Amino acid sequence: MINRRQRLEFALTLLPYDPETVQLSETQKKVEAIIARLRTDDSFTEEESDDCKVRRIQDANEFADSAMRHIEMSDSGKLSTLETLTLAAEKLLRTQRSPDQDFDDMVQDVEYSQLMRNTIQAVNEARLKLLQQWERSKRKALDLLTIEIEKVQEMDQEPEHKQSHEQDQDQEQSSEPFNAFRDGADEHNTSTPKTNDEDLGLDDDDEDYVPGGEETMGNKRKRIKKPVTSTPNAKRRCPGFEFDLDGESPMVTIGPNGTEVSRISLSAINWDMTGPSITRKLLCEIFDRDTLAHHTLSGKPSPAFRDCARPSKQQLDPLKVADLVYLMTNSLDMTPREVRTAITTKCADENKMLRSRMQRKSK
């Protein structure tokens, strides 16, 4: 094994340069100074044999062949740096290593390659987990987005339903002044008096009320009751009630909300009358006349009197109204709209008669 002095001296002898034409770098100058100092060292006094000399020359030739492939000339004519020479010397030393060292290096390389494979596999598994987690997050975000879109669609549909419902209510309320005007015109029309209580839209409660002083006014028409024939129509019996569990109770539950009506009053109603007339009868049994005069079906002011200074009315109990609608739609061939129209008309009539009574009292 050659020492540092021999390696540097041998590398310097192989340099293909002319000291007069080639300018050395600072690093190369330091190399020459080191070699000159080593040449003055007397520690290397061993004499070589002929065989050793031939072997050294042969090794030198092999080293020269390999070193020449690593020595490069720069554009300015300078030689390679000290690192190139050192690399060539290390390659020469590496060729002189023992088989045990080569085996250790091979084992190290195998272990290093195995470590790299394990590292790459671990990194790939971590990336796969991240991709799966990202996929789950993306699906969750898509589900949440779908839910939000459905909520927005429902919110967009709600104003349409609400608008249609308000239009229906406004239409019902707009019919109130017309019905009041129609009823008022019928009441004050004396040219063609009507003799049918059903055509007048009056019930027994309306007929029972006679304002004070009306008997003395001969110019007012009188209501003529229907003539009783010798063969009157058979009175239809009171229908059965779904929620009437106790037949001996004086009150009958007519709907799922627990609204009760007197059993005697239900038996006294002529169920052969039209649906609106029966609705008005039952409405007077559920609410008193003062309540009907000061309440409406929706509780909203009529659009016909929006700019007028009219007192606002309250809403009828929606549970009782729902029970009445339930009874009439299940017992008779009526639609919920027909029942609500009859309720609206009855409230308008009671309010009109209340105002008439108040005007007569003020006079």
UniProtKB/Swiss-Prot annotation:
It is found in: Nucleus. Disulfide bonds: none annotated. Residues 198-209 have a biased composition (Acidic residues). Residues 155-242 are annotated as: Disordered. Residues 255-354 form the BEN domain. One of its GO terms (molecular function) is transcription corepressor activity. One of its GO terms (biological process) is negative regulation of Notch signaling pathway. The keyword Transcription applies. Residues 155-168 have a biased composition (Basic and acidic residues). Its main location: nucleus. Keywords: DNA-binding, Nucleus, Repressor, Transcription, Transcription regulation. It comes from the Eukaryota. GO terms for cellular component: chromatin silencing complex; nucleus. The heterotrimeric Elba complex is required for chromatin domain boundary function during early embryogenesis. It binds to a 8-bp sequence 5'-CCAATAAG-3' in the Fab-7 insulator or boundary element in the bithorax complex and contributes to its insulator or boundary activity. Elba1 may act as a transcriptional repressor and binds the palindromic sequence 5'-CCAATTGG-3' to mediate transcriptional repression. The BEN domain mediates DNA-binding. The heterotrimeric Elba complex consists of Elba1, Elba2 and Elba3. This is Early boundary activity protein 1. It comes from Drosophila melanogaster (Fruit fly).
